[in-house]
């Protein structure tokens, strides 16, 4: 099952910025199958990190292709193939979609229970959109990535009437991309933090139990 982002020329309502909260973390491995320049990837990750930071979520990025990767080979390989919902997700940048409309910018893959670890974004479509707006390529790339990762963390039926999770982005959203003003809503932010926080708590309990320490 997939959830995608469509970009067309249609108006949209505004949104409210969400203030920072106590942060939880998520790791996102990025597969640069479209050979996007490293500087563009880095700037897009900074934009996506900003969006998630406003939602109270810290993102750790693991770049799985390109000469600028800094992790050692073994760690690189492990990080790029392992996924753990919802704490470790995979983002793939591909040249174009297969079988989808050219104005679809990305898609997330969810199972019937609403969980999923992989999202794809489509570089050629984003490049084409860049030629029609004043937003930078990295800003569009980062915000599209945030939308698709948002689907993975929010689950099914997670499109919204406004904000970064709106299904159809029009001039208002694109203007907000330019001004770095596109955000998750407070409700969306709380839902994502809750899911990640619960996963962290379960992981700590498992580590505590596996340590064999019984306490007093």
Description of each model-found segment:
Residues 10-18:
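Boundary at the C-terminal end of the N-terminal hydrophobic targeting segment
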Residues 38-152:
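Metzincin-family zinc-dependent endopeptidase catalytic domain
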Residues 9-11, 55, 157:
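Hydrophobic alpha-helical elements and their junctions with loops/disorder across both membrane
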Residues 20-22, 85:
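Solvent-exposed loop and beta-edge segments used for protein-protein assembly and interaction
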Residues 1-10:
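Bacterial N-terminal signal peptides
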Residues 24-26:
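Short structural boundary motif marking the start of a folded domain
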Residues 17-20, 29-46, 107-135, 139-140, ...:
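Metalloprotease/metallohydrolase-associated module, dominated by Zn2+-dependent proteases
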């Amino acid at each position: 099952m997939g959830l995608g982002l469509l970009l067309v020329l249609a108006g949209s309502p505004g949104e409210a910025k969400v203030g920072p909260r106590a942060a939880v973390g998520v790791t996102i491995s990025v597969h640069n199958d479209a050979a996007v320049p490293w500087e563009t990837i880095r700037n897009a990750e900074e934009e996506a990190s900003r969006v998630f930071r406003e939602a109270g979520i810290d993102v750790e990025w693991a770049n799985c292709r390109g000469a600028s990767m800094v992790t050692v080979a073994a760690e690189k390989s492990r990080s790029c193939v392992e996924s753990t919902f919802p704490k470790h997700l995979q983002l793939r940048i591909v040249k174009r979609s297969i079988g989808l409309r050219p104005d679809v910018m990305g898609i997330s893959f969810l199972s019937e229970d609403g969980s999923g670890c992989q999202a794809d974004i489509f570089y050629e479509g984003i490049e084409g959109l860049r030629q029609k707006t004043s937003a930078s390529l990295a800003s569009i790339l980062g915000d599209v990535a945030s939308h698709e990762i948002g689907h993975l963390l929010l689950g099914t039926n997670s499109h919204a009437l406004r904000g970064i999770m709106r299904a159809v982005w029009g001039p208002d959203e694109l203007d907000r991309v330019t001004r770095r003003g596109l955000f998750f809503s407070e409700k969306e932010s709380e839902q994502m933090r809750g899911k990640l926080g619960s996963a962290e708590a379960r992981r700590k309990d498992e580590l505590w139990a596996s340590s064999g320490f019984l306490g007093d």
